Amino acid sequence: MEHPWIPNSHKAILDEMLEAIGVSSVDDLYRDIPPTILLSPEEWDSLPIGEGRPLSEAEVLARINDILSRNKYFTDPPPFVGGGVWPRYVPSVVKALITRGEFLTAYTPYQAEISQGLMQALFEYQSLVAELLEMEVVNASLYDWSSAVGEAMLMARRVTRRNRVLVPETMNPLHLETATTYAYGGGIRVEKVRVDRETGFIDLEDLESRLSQGDTAALYMEYPSSYTGVIDENVEAAGEAVHKAGGLFILGVEPVSMAILKPPGRLGADIAVGDGQPLGLGLNYGGPYLGVFAVRWDGRLVRQMPGRLIGMTVDAEGRRAFAMILQTREQHIRRAKATSNITTNEALMAIAAAVYLSLLGPQGLREVAEASWYMSHYAAKRLSELRGVEAPLLEGEFIMDFTVRLPMDAGVARRRLLEKGVLAGIPLGGFSFFSDNDMLLTVTEAHTRRHVDLLVNLLDSVLGG
């Protein structure tokens, strides 16, 4: 029987469709799905949809709003949580511009003749990020930071023809999990390098020992670390060491921090990756975010880059024009021999980042980074005044993320703060060398002194102060 809410479920229509594709029944289409989780046609009528009747638009909206009302929102104060994405203030103009019809698509502008505006916006994104990172070539986006790390590892293997990548033991576990999945498919071994327990800096002696084995394709580091917050002062020495050993240096960065830190181009990075989320994308459960990927000017590297590249040229009449370039690297040309299987990407998010960077300019971005530094250090100072709290735990300098040691289990403290309306930190128990009492806290320009004081006072009460 035809189901009122499932299109093309009438038997005559189904039979015609099945005959056209050469199968005898709907079951043939789902043969690979375990029968225990498959909904049979006989069960369609029992689907818990609506009120036993079609709903009006107003009724549907009321139902959706009821469901959404169960969500918890953290705006005052914003969450004190980072770990790879961060609470940032997003100017209203960003959403206003990227929701224009000219931009509102995630699809690739293959037909350059009718996509000049979109392509120019992506070219501007590439140019702005290249200036920020001081790297010569930037692609038009990957999915997120994790996928960018994975692609960088695969690229390093192709360039060096080696199959081992070194990472610090405090590498963001979410980035590591995804990157390791990419690496496994490429036959790459990911190996951890020791980190100093006091400073959070990479251990140069352990790094040199591992590099001496001679099969290292790349070293990956984060600057600052997205899971400890530490700005590693050994980063340049580590980069020089891996270059001396014949490997590539991959540096993961938080882009706003680059307004006040030495950028990867000046730190000797061959490949720079990161997430554009802080550049006007806000916080969303699962995204969409923006994978940043850049390389220095080297033909070996550029030819092995993943993802779209937008270039500027002139048309047959001498007018400035934009087009996708070096497409022979890509899947729609090379298929299985492409540098990556990414095609359609996060172009809309890249345009959002371009709007944000254009709006703030160099001075505005610097002010955001400085405000984050000030607020996070204010928070660390206030927290250190609480009895039994050590903040920051690691000695290395930080900008917005920092580790804290509490006199109680960090997971328990986090749950109790959540009950009081504050989402605070990431418990670090079980991660690297941290204990169950350790937590990663994040404070950015989106927080005020009032927000920090509220956190400190509530934590004091949770700790029994």
Swiss-Prot record:
It is an enzyme of class 1 (oxidoreductase). Pfam families: GDC-P (PF02347). Coiled coil: none annotated. Keywords: Oxidoreductase. The keyword Protease does not apply. One of its GO terms (biological process) is nucleoside metabolic process. Gene3D superfamilies: Aspartate Aminotransferase, domain 1, Type I PLP-dependent aspartate aminotransferase-like (Major domain). It comes from the Archaea. One of its GO terms (molecular function) is glycine dehydrogenase (decarboxylating) activity. The keyword Oxidoreductase applies. Its EC number is 1.4.4.2. It catalyses: N(6)-[(R)-lipoyl]-L-lysyl-[glycine-cleavage complex H protein] + glycine + H(+) = N(6)-[(R)-S(8)-aminomethyldihydrolipoyl]-L-lysyl-[glycine-cleavage complex H protein] + CO2. CDD domains: GDC-P. The glycine cleavage system is composed of four proteins: P, T, L and H. In this organism, the P 'protein' is a heterodimer of two subunits. The glycine cleavage system catalyzes the degradation of glycine. The P protein binds the alpha-amino group of glycine through its pyridoxal phosphate cofactor; CO(2) is released and the remaining methylamine moiety is then transferred to the lipoamide cofactor of the H protein. Belongs to the GcvP family. N-terminal subunit subfamily. This is Probable glycine dehydrogenase (decarboxylating) subunit 1. It comes from Aeropyrum pernix (strain ATCC 700893 / DSM 11879 / JCM 9820 / NBRC 100138 / K1).
